[in-house]
């Protein structure tokens, strides 16, 4: 009964949102199409946390031709989710960004290989699939830093390259491509998998970003948005079943095909990534040491041309 009441509330809020779109003040864009990876934002909207903060928010998902990074640069979106590695690449290219909320404290990135892996050195001489941008560039940087000869094969977001036999190994997210491989019948053994977080590279990933200019001119609204989002993730962590229902509702509304099993897996994995590996708590703060590790590896691996400091990315 409780879940039915919540779903009725969600539906009413959807109708309300559609009625106020023309008065939108803030546009937020996640990294990809609707899915459980962005559950905290959906909860913040559906539970009225944005509205309580006096904000009118539209969640606008990106497309292949108009990414969240492009939307932020053009001003079409005011706030976006970015993996830390992506944010640093953008800053290296000249964008001035501010991290206003670091919700994923851990890395969900992993390497999956056809042959047993003892370390990343075993990728030497192999063809390895990787995402075109984002956290996978961190692994590319590690490979370059230690002079591994890896044939990197880019993909957008799917496990088909690995399933087709076109590559020897692939980078994957624990909450997405790993499930795709399991669902496709791959019986992966522990020795075929390396989690980056288990080998000293547990760097934070998804965070909330704005441009420095927008932050200076709309500081109060941005901080209210960040706090409402934090509340959304907290509610999601405490109500995973209801949150899953909400995610499926958002996916249907955005015409994104999926199934409840994949999204349940994704939500469970993403909720794990919220916790600080040192304390087990959800801090929503970018850890300086984890940031420095990310920036240093990207620089030493020639992904970025100059080191970026913690002070450059935090609130002025």
Located regions from the model:
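Bacterial N-terminal signal peptides that target proteins for export
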Residues: 1-8
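Bacterial N-terminal signal peptides
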Residues: 8-17
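Sec/Tat signal peptide C-region and signal peptidase I cleavage site
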Residues: 18-22
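Short, glycine-/small- and polar/acidic-enriched structural segments
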Residues: 23-155, 159-175, 194, 202
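Sec/Tat-exported extracytoplasmic proteins
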Residues: 45-48, 53-54, 76, 81-84, ...
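Pocket-lining segment of extracytoplasmic ligand-binding domains
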Residues: 85-86, 157-161, 165-256
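Secondary-structure end/capping motifs
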Residues: 217-301
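Hinge/cleft segment of the Venus flytrap/periplasmic-binding protein
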Residues: 294-296, 300-316
């Amino acid at each position: 009964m409780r879940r039915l009441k919540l779903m009725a509330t969600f539906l009413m809020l959807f109708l309300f949102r559609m009625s106020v779109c023309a008065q939108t003040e803030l546009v937020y864009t996640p990294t990809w199409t609707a899915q459980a990876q962005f559950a905290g934002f959906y909860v913040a909207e559906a539970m009225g946390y944005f509205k309580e903060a006096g904000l009118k928010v539209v969640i606008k998902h990106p497309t292949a031709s108009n990414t969240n990074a492009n939307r932020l640069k053009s001003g079409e979106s005011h706030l976006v989710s970015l993996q830390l590695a992506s944010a640093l690449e953008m800053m290296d290219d000249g964008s001035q960004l501010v991290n206003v909320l670091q919700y994923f404290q851990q890395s969900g990135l992993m390497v999956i290989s056809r042959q047993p892996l003892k370390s990343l050195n075993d990728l030497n001489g192999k063809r390895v699939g990787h995402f075109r941008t984002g956290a996978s560039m961190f692994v590319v940087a590690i490979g370059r830093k230690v002079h591994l000869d890896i044939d990197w094969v880019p993909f957008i977001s799917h496990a088909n390259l690995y399933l087709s036999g076109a590559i020897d190994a692939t980078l994957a997210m624990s909450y997405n491509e790993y499930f795709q491989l399991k669902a496709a019948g791959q019986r992966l053994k522990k020795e075929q998998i390396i989690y980056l977080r288990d080998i000293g590279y547990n760097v934070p990933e998804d965070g909330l970003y704005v441009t420095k200019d927008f932050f200076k001119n709309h500081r109060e609204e941005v901080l209210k948005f960040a706090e409402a989002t934090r509340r959304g993730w907290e509610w999601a962590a405490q109500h995973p079943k209801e949150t899953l229902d909400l995610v499926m509702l958002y996916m249907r509304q955005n015409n994104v095909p999926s199934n409840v099993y994949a999204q349940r897996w994704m939500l469970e994995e993403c909720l794990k990534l919220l916790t600080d590996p040192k304390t087990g708590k959800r801090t929503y703060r970018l850890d300086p040491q984890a940031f420095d590790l990310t920036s240093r590896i990207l620089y030493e691996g020639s992904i970025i041309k100059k080191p970026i400091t913690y002070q450059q990315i935090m609130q002025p």
